[in-house]
């Protein structure tokens, strides 16, 4: 359901003059009316012409097109965001296809690597280990009192780029930009946070421009105590906030999620968001082929927290479709750098143990090796689906893809690693190696592939189709927790919007132009499931929809009235 348009109420503003122009959430620039210029001491501080936001956006678009590199475009957009947030979101929404890869992946990776070099203006909160005893004071310094969504990172596993120290702040900033652009969550309600626990990146430690704490990363009890101090301070300041963990290292991501998901409304997008969008994509792809996900055999390359999170959600979905847990697990094969995960493999991580295959069941496999490689697994399993979350480029070789295609006429291949420099195989190669028969979805954006005069659109398995809707649903319903069932409901709703399912052709995922509509639908599904699960107060469907409408922010200027502080 589309939101009903209604007249925005005036805002009462205590700021005036140059201070108002320096306030990104309130600044209108040349769009201040003459009455507002008189009332807020702005006469003479702006050019004579009063512009509309669309006129401002057109000028910004022309300026944007003058930049030749993606990183320069990113810097330009961030500058607009830090001076006039309403204009920033109007511009981004006008050109979402073009600008999403610039404000987030893949360009945000380069922005994180060069964070200290391209730093212009502070945004968000930097909490260093050195300041751990001032945690409450730091959060009290945040001027926005009604924070509803926090994205926090410690910068240790930024995309596929590894330890970027405080440069990882680029990820929470970018992620929250998508919460607003795609999910309609007001930027006034969002807060990016980086926990500066040091860095083990020697290049950063040696960089005279590096702005973070120059110290090796704290670990073990020191680390977990510091994170706990942060969580407790957040609960004290904003007890109802949604906290998203982002780009934490594998060794910390799952323990933190398991420890806090029932203590504060929280989730890990790398684990749960990636799983939800992947499962939604697979549900849609399976339905488009006239079947169910439970009928497919699936091989993973990459058995870290993200890969295992996807696998567990696939298993949950196939159980919903009628499989027993044992049968569901027998259809999922996890391969890491040491080969196929089996019950005979030493040093497994806790979250890997339920995803092993019994070695005794593999005795008839066609291989002489003790280490079962990806090629061995593909040759013997004959999978329908191949998913890459390895963070290593080129591991889906021609031999592997052709071997898969031998036994599967319409293979589903999903190289999900970010950024594009880490993708397991390019869509161009996958399409060519399968004679145009593969259905391909990637983690990073790729242009359509032209092969033998036919155009193949490439779906981006983008978490932005999931997490903004989850955030909006949590806020609108007042959910106190994010349950697995809420995530599954998001996946199911995403699959329902697949053009391939709806029309029998096109992308397996919706187009970006429809992302706000999809986010609103996911928000309703998530909110409804939260009520059914008892983590949100039950209301009528109409009341939930109204709450979604009321909380959906639009990039439009409001009239200002003067008031005192």
Swiss-Prot record:
Divalent metal cations. Prefers magnesium or manganese. PANTHER family: MALIC ENZYME-RELATED, NAD-DEPENDENT MALIC ENZYME, MITOCHONDRIAL. NCBIfam families: PRK13529.1 (NF010052). GO terms for cellular component: cytosol. It comes from Escherichia coli O6:H1 (strain CFT073 / ATCC 700928 / UPEC). Homotetramer. It is an enzyme of class 1 (oxidoreductase). Keywords: Metal-binding, NAD, Oxidoreductase. InterPro entries: Aminoacid_DH-like_N_sf, Malic_enzyme_CS, Malic_N_dom, Malic_N_dom_sf, Malic_NAD-bd, Malic_OxRdtase, NAD(P)-bd_dom_sf, NAD_malic_enz_proteobac. The active site is at residues 104, 175. The record marks 270 as: Important for activity. This is NAD-dependent malic enzyme. One of its GO terms (biological process) is malate metabolic process. The keyword NAD applies. Belongs to the malic enzymes family. Its cofactor is Mg(2+); Mn(2+). It comes from the Bacteria. The keyword Oxidoreductase applies. Pfam families: malic, Malic_M. Its EC number is 1.1.1.38.
């Amino acid at each position: 359901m589309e939101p009903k348009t209604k007249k925005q109420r005036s805002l009462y503003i205590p700021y005036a003059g140059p201070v108002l122009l320096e306030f990104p959430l309130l600044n209108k620039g040349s769009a201040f009316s003459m009455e507002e210029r008189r009332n807020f001491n702005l006469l003479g501080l702006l050019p004579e012409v009063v512009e509309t936001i669309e006129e401002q956006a057109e000028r910004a678009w022309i300026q944007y097109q003058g930049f030749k590199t993606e990183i320069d475009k990113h810097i330009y957009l961030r500058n607009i965001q830090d001076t006039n947030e309403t204009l920033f979101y109007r511009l981004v929404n006008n050109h979402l296809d073009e600008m999403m890869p610039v404000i987030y992946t893949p360009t945000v990776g380069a922005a994180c690597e060069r964070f200290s070099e391209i730093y212009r203006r502070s945004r968000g909160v930097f909490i260093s280990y050195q300041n751990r005893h001032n945690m409450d004071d730091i959060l009290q310094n945040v001027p926005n009192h009604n924070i509803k969504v926090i994205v926090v990172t410690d910068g240790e596993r930024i995309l596929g780029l590894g330890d970027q120290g405080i440069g990882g702040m680029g990820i929470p900033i970018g992620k929250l930009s998508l919460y607003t652009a795609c999910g309609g969550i007001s930027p006034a309600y969002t807060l990016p946070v980086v926990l500066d626990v040091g860095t083990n990146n020697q290049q950063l430690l040696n960089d005279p421009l590096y702005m973070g704490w120059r110290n090796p990363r704290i670990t073990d009890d020191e680390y977990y105590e510091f994170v706990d101090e942060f969580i407790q301070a957040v609960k004290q300041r904003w007890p109802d906030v949604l906290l998203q963990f982002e780009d934490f290292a594998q060794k910390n991501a799952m323990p933190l999620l398991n420890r806090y998901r029932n203590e504060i409304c929280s989730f890990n997008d790398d684990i749960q968001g990636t799983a939800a969008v992947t499962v939604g994509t697979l549900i849609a792809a399976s339905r488009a082929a006239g079947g169910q996900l439970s009928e497919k055999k699936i091989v993973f390359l990459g058995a870290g927290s993200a890969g295992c999170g996807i696998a567990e959600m696939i298993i949950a979905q196939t159980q919903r479709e009628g499989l027993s847990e044992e049968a569901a697990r027998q259809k999922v094969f996890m391969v890491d750098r040491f080969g196929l995960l089996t019950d005979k493999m030493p040093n497994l991580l806790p979250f890997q143990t339920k995803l092993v295959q019994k070695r005794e069941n593999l005795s008839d496999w066609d291989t002489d090796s003790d280490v079962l490689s990806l090629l061995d697994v593909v040759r013997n399993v004959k999978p329908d689906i191949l998913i890459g979350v390895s963070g290593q480029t080129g591991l889906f070789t021609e031999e592997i893809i052709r071997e898969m295609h031998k036994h599967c006429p319409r293979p589903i291949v999903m190289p999900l690693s970010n950024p594009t420099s880490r993708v397991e195989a390019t869509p161009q190669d996958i399409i060519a190696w399968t004679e145009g028969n593969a259905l391909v979805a990637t983690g990073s954006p790729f242009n359509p592939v032209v092969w033998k005069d036919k155009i193949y659109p490439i779906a981006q398995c983008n978490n932005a189709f999931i997490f903004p809707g989850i955030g909006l649903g949590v806020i609108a319903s007042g959910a106190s927790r994010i349950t697995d069932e809420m995530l599954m409901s998001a996946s199911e709703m995403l699959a329902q919007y697949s053009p391939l399912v709806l029309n029998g052709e096109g992308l397996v995922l919706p187009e970006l132009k429809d992302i706000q509509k999809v986010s609103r639908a996911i928000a309703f599904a998530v909110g409804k499931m939260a009520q059914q699960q008892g983590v949100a107060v039950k209301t009528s469907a109409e009341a939930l929809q109204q709450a979604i409408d009321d909380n959906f922010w639009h990039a439009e200027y409001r009239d200002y009235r003067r008031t005192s502080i």
